[in-house]
Structures are given as structure tokens and as C-alpha cells.
Amino acid sequence: MLFKFLRLVFRLMFRLTVEGDIKQFNHPKCLITPNHVSFLDGVLLTLFLPVKPVFAVYSNIANRGFMKLVSRYVEIVPLDPINPMAVRILVKEIEKGRPIVVFPEGRITVTGSLMKIYDGAAFIAAISEAVVVPVRFEGLERTLFSRLKGIFKLHLFPKVTMKILPATQLLMPNASSSEQRRRLAGERLHEIMMNARMATRPQETIFESLLVARKQFGRFKPCIEDVSFKEDSYNSLLKKVLAASRILQRFTCQGERIGFLLPNATIMVAAIFGASLRGRIPALLNYTTDSHGLKNALAVASIKTIVTSRQFLKKERLTHLSEQVTEVNWVYLEDLESTVTLLDKLWILWHLFFPKQAMVAQKPDDDALVLFTSGSDAVSKGVVHSHASLLANVEQIKTITDFNPLDRFMSSLPLFHAFGLTVGLFTPLLSGSRIFLYPNPLHYRVVPELVYECNCTVLLGTSSFLENYAYSAHPYDFARLRCVIAGIEKLAENTKQIWQDKFGIRILEGYGMTECAPVIALNVPMMAKVGTVGRILPAMEFRLIPIAGIKQGGRLQLRGPNMMKGYLRMEDPNHLEPPAVKDEHGNIQFDWLDTGDIVSIDEQGFCTILGRGKRFAKQGELDGGKADFVTLCKIAEAE
């Protein structure tokens, strides 16, 4: 009777719903592995699981006084990670047909992301040959019973969902020692837990994701600032997004690709989201290219309108572009300010309270954005990403990192590059972190000063940029930095060394390409290995195609939710060419992408770039190739 009453209370207070197949818990050998986000996790499992499980509780918690009261209602077995006898007890319970609940993290998260995973839970599953059933709680981390006070905005009774994921078999790894088998099993369980998060990610558009962030982190939470030094909250950013959408719809059609030739600034961000919410497709143009390159991009994506700023063109000495490229309609921001009417202002005010009403009907798999890459053949191609692929890469990054509302990003890499766009804009904006947008990464003295002045905790850059920042910066300029990510070119040893010696900071390397939105692999503090570009991101499949004459490694092919919809090529701009590859038998397979890179992947999943294929891929790359780095360097020419 008590349990029935408590179930009713929780359903009413937290609007709790249970999703997934509960029949999985009837498996004769079952290990249940929930994420651990609050003190209520165990209570809800006790109340809403269709079975009566045994709870394996780490001994430092199980021996506390209040657990004696809890043990009256649920069966508890203390689990000591370093005591093999405790593991044997749980294995025997599983063999008796008793379902076991183990929190693999061993403690409540203090970051909002997965904490480290203890090997004990994985070893129990591997020894007993039990199926692993991941359970994810969403919403409990926003309650007062979490440990995220001061980091996230907490609510008294947020909406809570308990999601049950498909059962997975965790086999005993092949290794020479029990210690290695235990470690590899733990890494496999970590992978299962990360994939569980990816499997339960919301399916939405990029504008809907902005609204979710606004609700989660607070409408008046500061989120973005540029060189005007006027910081916008989520609410004031939404106001600018609505204004941009209202204006853009006057001279564009739904489904049309709009070219944006703008620097890193809040207005650029507002234009991207504003175009998207009204069903337009932003095409982010490279303003460092010449008129010929710009014409190619316009032709490839069938762009009829370019939105830019006279002030920007004049400052960067780009006025010749509008004079030489005459086949499109040039729209200037300065001309649009005077066109806003009273009716427009009332429309914006209304939709500031009801923003979803401003959206046109869209699906997550619809075209969301066009980026451009020249690849190895130096011919411009349009890379079309959907809402789902962009947000999948954001979720992959959030799954392996712990970015939170206390962080502040220095985003100086151009937004027309996938690295700058996804890692420098979408990820922090949707994580509640603040962003400072700076238009030129080659201002080697200014960027470190701004990092210091703005108390930035995350910095993105290339090896060359980071090296020059290190030489120009005062030793205390980077005192608040806790994460430095290098991409686009190989991270040089001397760059690593000067950052370690002068600032005591380890630079994290990654690997990616525009077609993957862009991150494919990334070293993070929890999972890092020197000489590699990190592990392949969760929810991505990979395979190595053997290459004649190469004994170690192979050509990397990928498939995952962050993959582009396809290419736009000059030969047929109206045709979207889906990704396709030849497998090792020479058969064509769609939905796979050939990176052209020769890599090796060790037993722990760490990826090492061995050679360069047609894409000029290199170690530490996070977007495109050699041509992208050259493009970035051209930014300085206008200064």
C-alpha cells in the first residue's frame, strides 16, 4: 500500500513517465545499470521497476546510518570495488535469477554528465554472462535532490522520465591478465552508458533546441557576447532571432538557401537561428575567398541572396565582392533596420512569449544548414547537414565532456567552419555556457587578453594559433582555462610543451571532418592518450578497409547520426548526393562515409592517424583539411 501511494505521489509531482520495454527485466540473468543523477534514483527504481531487485551499493555509502532504514524495504549488498568477494556474492545472486541494480558511476554526478565508470559492475556482467539493461533518468538532475546546485538551474518538481534501453550482452574481453580484462570490460560498460545517452537524445530542430536551453538554464541567463561587449541572455537572443526571422522572410522563400557573409557576431547567430525557424536554410559563406571561389559556392548551393553588412565589407576590404559578384541579390543589415514596423514589433513581442508559434513545420531530418569544403580536389562542394546531424554531434560532445553553465568559451574560429560552428557555438549555447565571439583568431595579443578579461574557461584553436597565443600571453592570462582543444592542423610538439611549461595546461587533440559536423574523435580528460586523436565518438560505427602494402591499420570508414545528408556539387546543384562508399569487397554501400585517412585503432578504441589520404587529413584535425588551415590564415590579410 505504501509503494502504491508513493508511486501516485511521484507521478503527480514529477509527471513521471516510464518509457521502454519493461519485459527485459524478466531475463533470467539481468544487471540493471542506471545513470546516477540524484538521491531519488534508487527510490524511483524501487517503486517503478516491475521486479524486486537487489541493490549493489558501494560500501562507503552502504555503511552509513540512514541505509539501515532503507534496508528494511529493499535488499542491499555492499559492494567494495577492490574486494573480489563482494563481486562473487553479486554473481551468485545473478545466477539465482535475482536482478541486480548497480550504479556504475558509484556516486551522484557533480557535473551533469557521466562520471567515471567503475570496472566492478562490468566485471560482474561479464563473469555472470548477464544482460546489461541501461536505465536513464532525465529531469532528476534538475531537482533539489541532485548535487548540481550552483551549476544548473534547479526546480522543485521538474518533468522526470525513466527510460529503459535495450538489453546488451557484455562478453568477457580477451586479454592476457585479469586486470586487463577487468579494465576493458569497464570501458565497454562506459561505452554502453554513453550510447544509452545518445539513444535517448531528443529529436528536434536547432531552433527547438535553443528553446529547450532557454527553459533549462533560465531565460535571463547570459549566454552570448561579441566585440560590442553587450552580453545577451537567452531571452534577448531569442528576441533578435525572432526579429531576424521576421525580416528574412520578406525577401526569401521557405526552403530557399540563404548565403550569410558575416563575421563572428551575435547578429550572425541570430540570422542562423532566425532563418532556420522559418524554414530557410543558412549557407555559411567563406569571406576569405576571392570572387571566383564565392561564385562557385553560390552556384553549388543555388544561392540567390547574400546577407551581409556594409560595415563588415568595408572593414575587411571586401567591397569588391559585391561589385564582382552581380548574379545574386545583396542584402545589407544596415538597410534592414529602418524596415521594422510597429506590426513587426508586436509580432516579435507576441512570439517572445509563444516562440513555438513562430516556427514553420519542420522535421529533424530536414535540411538545416550548408557548409562548404574543397576537400582534396580543390573544387568547392556544399555539405548539407540536417537538424538531427548537427544536434547529434553536439550531444556526442556533451556525452564525453562536462561543459556546464559555469564555463565560458572563447570562440574566435570562424563560424563558416564546422569546428567553429559546432564546438564554438552550438555546443556551449546548448550546454548553458557563455560564449564570447571574436572575429579574428590571428590577433595573437588580443585573444589572450580577452580570455583573461572575460574569465574564459574553454579555448579553441589550431596548433599555430595556440603557439602564438602562448608566446604573446602573460603567464596569468590563461589561469582560468580548464580546457584547450586543438583542431584543423596537427598539434606540434613544441606547442604542447610551451603550454605545459608556461601555463601547466594539457592541450586536447581531436579529429574530424566537415561531413561529420565535424567531430569524429576527441581526447578528453577522462579518456586521453598521448599520440592519438582520442576515441571515436559514441553512437558512431567504424571499420578499417585493408590497404595493399600497409600491415597496420586501414582506410577509415564511418557511419553515425552526425553524418551529413549529402553533397551539393557543381555538376548538378539541384541533386543531393548521399554519402556512399565501397566496402572491402568492392560493393557500394550507402550511409557510410570514406574519410580517405589511414588510421589504426587500439584495443581501448584510441585512434591514431597513420597517413594522409585524398582529403589531406592529418592528426589533430577537426575540420576539413589543409585547405581549411590556409583559409583561416587568410583572415589576417584584411587586417
From Swiss-Prot:
Key word Acyltransferase present: yes
HAMAP family: Aas
Entry's EC annotation: 2.3.1.40, 6.2.1.20
Gene name in the database record: aas
Transmembrane segments: 258-277, 409-433
The protein's name: Bifunctional protein Aas
Residue segments, region AMP-binding: 233-619
Catalytic residues (UniProt): H36
Principal cellular location given in the protein's record: membrane
